[in-house]
Amino acid sequence: MKVINHIKEIRTSKAITQVQMAEDLQITRQTINAIEKNKYNPSLELALKIAKYFNVPFEELFYLEEEE
């Protein structure tokens, strides 16, 4: 199974740049980019911080994609 996220969609709908989000969460823009491209899964702590940052339920940001 693969973890998929909706961070980019939510971030852009709120007109937040990767740079601004990275500064607010005290991580690098490259980390945000890698997470959005599903190349890196954030730690549980960071995933929860992102959900809190956007004020959305964790399940709205991340879900498991079933393999065929």
Stretches with model-predicted labels:
Residues T12, E23, K52:
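Alpha-helical residues within the helix-turn-helix
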Residues M1-S13:
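A short, Lys/Arg-rich alpha-helix, primarily the initiator
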Residues F62-E68:
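Short, charged recognition helix plus adjacent turn
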Residues T12, Y40-N41:
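Short amphipathic helical patch at the helix-1/turn junction of helix-turn-helix
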Residues E45-E60:
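DNA major-groove recognition helix of helix-turn-helix/homeodomain DNA-binding modules
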